[in-house]
Amino acid sequence: MSASEKVWEELAKNTLRGAMMSKGVSYAVLAERLAAIGVEDNELNLRNKVSRGRFTAVFLMQCLHVLGAEWIHLPKDLEDATGKHGAQSLAKKAPPTSI
């Protein structure tokens, strides 16, 4: 895997984590909400999948849907959304009705 791919995985992970933070949703609640739309996964599996940042666009859209996200904030500078505090940065910059 190239360094560039790792940056994109970090962005995907932090986008989802930022959405969860801004909506106040835990992995346990995310698992319940996903189950309600037919996506069966447990809390531990979700935590591992998200922490790796390796998931499909379909999974990301399913998660954002059950979180009630209306749009996705993608920063122009990827460094704003990657790294140790990238998810917090995304959660703070999003308007209240978005992620």
Specify the residue positions occupied by each region the protein language model found.
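A short, Lys/Arg-rich alpha-helix, primarily the initiator
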Residues: 1-26
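DNA major-groove recognition helix of helix-turn-helix/homeodomain DNA-binding modules
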Residues: 56-73
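Short, charged recognition helix plus adjacent turn
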Residues: 5-6, 74-99
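Short alpha-helical "recognition helix" segments of helix-turn-helix
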Residues: 30-34
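Recognition helix of helix-turn-helix/homeodomain-like DNA-binding domains
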Residues: 36-54
